[in-house]
Swiss-Prot record:
One of its GO terms (biological process) is regulation of mitochondrial mRNA stability. The keyword Transcription regulation does not apply. Keywords: Chloroplast, Plastid, RNA-binding, rRNA processing, Transit peptide. Residues 1-32 form a transit peptide. This is RAP domain-containing protein, chloroplastic. Residues 575-633 form the RAP domain. PROSITE patterns: RAP.
């Protein structure tokens, strides 16, 4: 009889659902006792206690266990001695059941319930008072949580969550559950660390009185430091001293910008590996220094904003400092009228190297660059044009100003500057700058600068402008013997000039400006060498390429079209397929970068039907079947 009661009842005759109900056998009256009392043998309702398993326990056990027990009513006053659902063949449910019994034996069920069960909504009668209570709750410090009152804990967590969301914050389910571990220990620790971090940052107020001698001494020590670690150690020492009561702080906005600039410069001096830079950037002291820089950014000079932007691009590359670059863009727009040509070029170059799109900032920098057109040095002009082209932002005001300068001058002359005979290197000190003179404009470019400008005009589609014509003519001064496939600088120059020349042939044949003779032959020969055409196939490309074979067509992979390598093509149909990974798009907005837009435009102009697949689209697909159907749809194979 007892064994029969513990087994789940059979299924209902007409599709009914089996409900497992656990009985408390100890309360059943025995047959002898019933006979002695002279009463008939039957199961009286008070003699059997039947209750459903709480919903939070079913949630913990999983969906498999949920079908084996009655969901019942949610009971706030939990009986932890209730029997669990009937045995199941699912080993996961059995393992969770054993863990649940162990947790109950240790008296930790309330903590587990707070982790598993979602916070309950508290019904409030008056809406007018609800808003005031939440605002007051957010302003006042939270009292310690009472672990003895589970319901109060749930209501308090609900208030905290609502206050956070009302303040513009977001909290996902995972963060909410982690915050409730160990009676909120991790949440409290996070809040303490956050308050300590804010308190440390507030100690460095730009409006505080200054100590000139300490500031100058610290600045000298930062400049004289030979390694990035030495610079960071100096700033960490000052931060610790300020936390202990040093006032005023010698770590002014100028010294903060100088420290970041010297850290990046020392990294560049030793060619530090990217992995080491990223590890350095994630250290506690470095995070504190970057946080101080963001706080002091509005008080920095235009040169300080430029130095911080350049430093972050060298330290974090395109992997870190996304919100920091957004803040730099906001502050730089307010200070752009005070920027000089160097500041304009450095800020644009740093955003381009980090693949961080900022259209409003680039637009403001372009207007400022057009005003400063006569003060640009050759390197600054090449860097700014390259930055705009890399982000696919055309600087129309600056291009118009350059064309106007060329037309207004009686003689416009561009020269090729070679610092060391027989070696092609960039010059650190330029011999001249673009000056506002009524007689002539003399530009003394290096080979790499001409390559950057030529590539920028090709990417922007502005090769029919007078300024580009004057720059392009200087290529006739090159000596072909100085181009080799053994140097990275040579390969970069060849790739830029070769693509610009091919664009002139294909998109601007009416200009009749393409290179001819030995120079074109040497560029083409170097561009087709094995060292120049080294290919790297990502796992994303391999995954998509494998599914391409399932479309029923024979694809030619890694096909070359006039210097461009296309991932896969159908030659007979003139169909080109490009697989664009994250490096083809800006990291924050997901817009195509300049080199991607130029490649698409060039392949389409060459007569190919180009179809592109971005990694964002691919990540939204689930399963190979859906991926294959998507490929067939974008390639136009649905009708087959």
């Amino acid at each position: 009889m007892e064994a029969a009661l513990l087994r789940p009842p059979p299924l209902a005759a007409r599709g009914g659902v089996s409900i497992a109900i656990a009985f408390s056998v100890s309360r059943l009256p025995s047959a002898a006792a019933a006979a002695a009392a002279g009463k008939p043998r039957k199961l009286a309702p008070p003699a059997c206690r039947c209750r459903a398993t709480p919903q939070w326990q079913l949630d913990f056990l999983g969906a498999e266990a949920d079908t084996e027990a009655d969901g019942g009513d949610d009971d706030d006053d939990l009986d932890l001695d209730l029997s669990l659902p009937a045995e199941t063949n699912d080993w996961c449910v059995r393992a969770r059941r054993s863990a649940l019994r162990s947790i109950e034996a240790r008296g930790l069920s309330p903590s587990l319930q707070r982790m598993v069960a979602s916070p309950k909504k508290k019904n409030k009668k008056k809406k007018s008072k609800k808003t005031n209570l939440k605002q007051k709750k957010a302003a006042e410090p939270k009292p310690p949580r009472d672990t003895d009152d589970d319901e109060d804990d749930e209501e308090e967590a609900d208030d905290d969550l609502e206050a956070l969301l009302a303040g513009g914050g977001e909290l996902d389910d995972l963060e909410l559950r982690v915050a409730q571990f160990a009676d909120g220990m991790f949440d409290e620790k996070r809040q303490r660390n956050r308050e300590q971090f804010i308190q440390t940052l507030s100690a460095f107020s730009p409006a505080a009185p200054s100590n000139r001698s300490q500031e100058v001494s610290l600045n000298r020590s930062i400049v004289e430091a030979r390694t990035a670690d030495e610079v960071l150690a100096l700033t960490a020492e000052v931060v610790a001293a300020v936390a202990k009561g040093l006032s005023p702080s010698p770590l002014t906005p100028l010294n903060i910008a100088t420290a970041l600039h010297r850290i990046a410069k020392n990294m560049e001096a030793v060619s530090m590996l990217q992995t080491h830079r990223l590890g350095f950037a994630r250290s506690r002291d470095m995070s504190m220094l970057v946080g101080l820089a963001m706080v002091a950014l509005p008080e920095c000079s235009p040169q300080g904003v430029s130095n911080i932007s350049w430093a972050l691009s060298k330290i974090g590359g395109d992997l870190l400092y996304l919100p920091e670059m957004d803040r730099i863009a906001q502050v730089a727009i307010t200070k752009v009228d005070s920027f000089n040509a160097q500041n304009v070029a450095n800020v644009a170059g740093s955003f381009a190297s980090m693949r961080h799109s900022a259209p409003d900032l680039i637009s403001a920098l372009t207007r400022r660059a057009a005003e400063l057109v006569y003060t640009f040095k050759e390197q600054e002009l090449a860097q700014f044009l390259w930055g705009c082209a890399s982000l696919n932002e055309c600087p129309y005001p600056l291009l118009d100003a350059l064309d106007t300068a060329c037309r207004d001058a009686p003689s416009f002359d561009c020269h090729l500057h070679d610092t060391v005979p027989g070696m092609w290197q960039s010059s650190d000190k330029e011999a001249s700058s673009l000056k506002n003179s009524s007689n002539a404009y003399a530009l003394n470019f290096t080979r790499d600068q001409i390559g950057n400008i030529a590539w920028s005009y090709a990417v922007l589609g502005q090769m029919d402008r007078p300024f580009f014509s004057g720059i392009w003519k200087t290529l006739s001064q090159f000596e072909e013997r100085k181009i080799s496939d053994q140097y990275r600088e040579d390969m970069m120059f060849v790739s830029q000039v070769y693509l610009a020349n091919q664009s002139l042939k294909l998109e601007y044949p009416h200009l009749d400006m393409c290179l001819r003779g030995d120079l074109e032959e040497n560029l083409t020969k170097t561009g087709r060498s094995k060292r120049f055409n080294q290919k790297m196939t990502s796992s994303f490309q391999k995954e998509v390429g494998r599914l391409l074979c399932s479309t029923g067509h024979e694809w030619n992979k890694e096909y070359t079209i006039d210097g461009y390598t296309v991932d896969a093509v159908l030659v007979d149909e003139k169909l080109a397929f490009e697989i664009d990974g994250p490096s083809h798009f800006s990291r924050n907005l997901g817009t195509p970068l300049g080199h991607t837009a130029f490649k698409r435009r060039y392949i389409a102009a060459a007569g190919w039907n180009l179809v592109s697949l971005s990694h964002q689209e691919w990540e939204n697909l689930e399963g190979e079947f859906e991926q294959l159907e998507y490929l067939r749809r974008i390639l136009g194979f649905d009708a087959e």
